[in-house]
């Protein structure tokens, strides 16, 4: 898909739809293509804030610490935020985003252990638009 491997952009607009609720977030991150920021698996940081990620899915939940945002986060979240119940990021059990590593949950929210709003497995439909 040429929009993945050959289209430069200044920002991403990501949308997450659960049921009839669709919410959006703007991610300022200029790059030569989405392929260039994801395919090599290298971690690339951006920040839109924990609260913005939580606002994408009503009732979503994250652990309180770590809060790494970006591309190719810890444990294979392609675009999103990972959180942990410990101050380090070595064993995160929660995420909101796209390309999540859990079977049947590639976009959405998962949280286990010490979650802000209880354990979650929320499957979502994701949109990634480039500008």
Language-model region placement:
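Mature extracellular or lumenal effector domains of secreted proteins
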Residues: 1-131
């Amino acid at each position: 898909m040429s929009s993945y491997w050959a289209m430069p952009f200044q920002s991403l607009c990501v949308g997450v739809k659960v049921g009839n609720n669709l919410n959006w977030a703007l991610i300022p991150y200029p790059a030569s293509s989405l392929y260039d920021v994801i395919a090599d698996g290298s971690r690339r940081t951006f920040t839109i804030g924990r609260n913005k990620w939580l606002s994408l899915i009503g009732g979503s939940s994250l652990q309180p610490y770590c809060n790494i945002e970006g591309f190719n986060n810890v444990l294979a979240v392609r675009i999103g935020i990972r959180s942990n119940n410990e101050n380090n990021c070595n064993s995160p059990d929660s995420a909101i985003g796209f390309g999540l590593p859990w079977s049947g949950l590639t976009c959405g929210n998962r949280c286990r252990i010490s979650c802000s709003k209880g354990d979650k497995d929320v499957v979502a439909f994701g949109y990634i638009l480039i500008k």
